[in-house]
């Protein structure tokens, strides 16, 4: 589906909404910005992986363009749960952005044909899913419940122990194998 086929959710009140999608990787982040009030296509921008300041400045610039319309601006963002974890969600919400973290396994895939797997297409799909969620289509994908910092810290100790036990086993196997 082309980006020209995007349909914005019904407006609840006179608020301009900026939809932001993040396609995250270790080296670069692809950020898509879509505002129905400004045009029909998604603008794509690349920033270095982990550079939240550059990402937030990009979002702030788009927000300023929307504010010129004279409406209050709401920013909603989305990214797939995975390598970057939850810290980005906390950083975005601290900046006043409504963020959703999507379970990557719940993203619908067309099984009838092989689809190209590119960051650009994935970003488009993420923004389309965000638009659907905003329209109230809750069954389109699963939104991850973000744990509070205390719950996340409780998991960290167990994960570190698992890694250390695996390392110890590997060292023992290497010693007995020689």
Which stretches of residues belong to each language-model region?
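Phosphate- and other anionic-substrate recognition elements at nucleic-acid/protein interfaces
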Residues: 1-178
């Amino acid at each position: 589906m082309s980006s020209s086929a995007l349909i914005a959710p019904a407006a609840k009140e006179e608020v301009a909404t900026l939809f932001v999608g993040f396609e995250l990787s270790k080296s670069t982040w692809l950020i898509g910005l879509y505002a129905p009030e400004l045009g029909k296509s998604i603008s794509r921008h690349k920033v270095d992986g982990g550079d939240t300041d550059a990402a937030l400045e990009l979002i702030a610039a788009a927000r300023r363009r929307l504010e010129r319309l004279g409406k209050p601006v709401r920013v909603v963002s989305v990214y797939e749960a995975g390598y970057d974890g939850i810290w980005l969600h906390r950083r975005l919400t601290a900046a006043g952005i409504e963020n959703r973290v999507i379970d990557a396994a719940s993203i619908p895939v067309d099984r009838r044909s092989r689809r190209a797997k590119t960051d650009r297409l994935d970003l488009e799909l993420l923004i389309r899913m965000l638009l659907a969620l905003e329209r109230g289509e809750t069954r389109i994908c699963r939104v991850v419940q973000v744990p509070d910092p205390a719950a996340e810290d409780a998991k960290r100790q167990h994960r570190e122990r698992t890694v250390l036990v695996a390392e110890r086993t590997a060292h023992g196997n290497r010693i007995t194998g020689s």
